[in-house]
């Protein structure tokens, strides 16, 4: 951490909390798959919170903070997607970190410190009944986002200016083909095989695009949900968009190694819990069979995207840390592909390239 950054953070902390604010310590936090950087600043001074999280924007710039593939805005955003979504989520009652100050041109945001305990960390070692309780809390918060958020639709919120459509689904499928297969060291895949995969993927994309959309977080998983004061708080929401409601639910119950604790019986209970509460508040209730089919298609599509993404991070971005999650993701894909007649034909095609599917 350079001295000029420390000076800038001190300056902004004083602007937010008063001239007598000082920083007792400043610690870099482990990053995620993005180019954002985070620090925890322990504060001292009258009226200050004990600590804050400093978000440093990429290269200290005010460039839009969202996924690189999500460039589907009709016009360039006038503000950071994070700030735009933060304002909207606050109004509908989603628990997100408080924003203490924003200096976009200098690349600094000061946020409430929600601690270090993600939902995934909180449920480790717990009995199944308590795991069920925590994931129900996560579903309750998700339903606020999806139902209240969709009902309060505001076209100035950028999440309503973009949706998971055929183009975006196929972008993610092609990302898998490119980095999960073609560019992956030691893998050879024929042109005819990739063409056949794209036909099957296009059918899935059309099916998902035809589903009624609602507001989705887009990365609603156990590492983006923080446990704070016995409640679940939501972070990393800047890529929110319109998608089938099952997309975020599939993210919650199927990400990385989540199914090592969300076993089939627990998954079934949580699916029933979600569906019952969604149908209570939705204008268009779901038929259970249709709901489950779309849930599985969403889980399959997302896991294929994740495999491609994790190989991309390793091959292109030199971030190999996410590769450890690929085997468990592929094993889950094998199980889910076999649960639907329209996707089980993918199993032998992918088993040629992933030993976990054999």
Task: Locate each region found by the language model.
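Active-site catalytic-loop/activation-segment of kinase and kinase-like phosphoryl-transfer enzymes
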Residues: 160-204, 273, 334
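Juxta-kinase regulatory segment immediately upstream of eukaryotic protein kinase catalytic domains
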Residues: 1-22
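Helical subdomain adjoining the active site within ATP-dependent kinase catalytic cores
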Residues: 309-358
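Active-site activation/catalytic loop segments of kinase-like enzymes and analogous catalytic loops
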Residues: 177-184, 245-284, 297-317, 329-337
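ATP-binding pocket architecture of kinase catalytic cores
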Residues: 42-165, 169-171, 175, 182
